[in-house]
């Protein structure tokens, strides 16, 4: 694909720019130790993933801290250990503390020299504001679950994204969506007819982590392992005529 053929990039934030699995595990692991569960971070994240997606589906207007707390409590029920209010609040309040991936800030700064950058995220505004202190990026637009009253993979974010593109004077065909989660992003991006890049942050680990396995069709146009790889590929594309091939695997 020719990365120089696009004018804007829309990003999922958590899992793509911010290491939400590390942030969630930083609460789940000490809780498991306290309640006597001999489970590592990967197994805890796998137990948690479906619960968060279920809460988001059933309560689309719930604030994200509330989603986190409720999903944590349900995970405790699944694992046979209660989650107290203090632990639930600890996870719910933790979003601003979740770390950025090491390459995110520099890659965004580089990509911003070529594209308008937009955020399409399953979070609340205050949570993203805290996260952007780690990313240090001026985005052309930020679309959150709080703004659209729903959580991906529902299509609300992408409908709002298209309205934003109209305001920015950018055609849909000039937008490339960039995300890690097949479930949350590449399924609805396919439905919306968007080209997309899969940032496969879990390329060196088995399983799905904090993200459910997708049950609907998904596709992507390019797979990369990091945001740094995308920034380097964009620099190369804008420096010369050669594009970068990389077909995805349609489901």
Task: Give the predicted meaning of each segment.
Residues 1-6, 105, 109, 116-251:
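Asp-based, Mg2+/Mn2+-dependent phosphohydrolase catalytic module
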Residues 2-102, 113:
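N-terminal helical cap/lid subdomain that shapes the substrate entry/recognition surface
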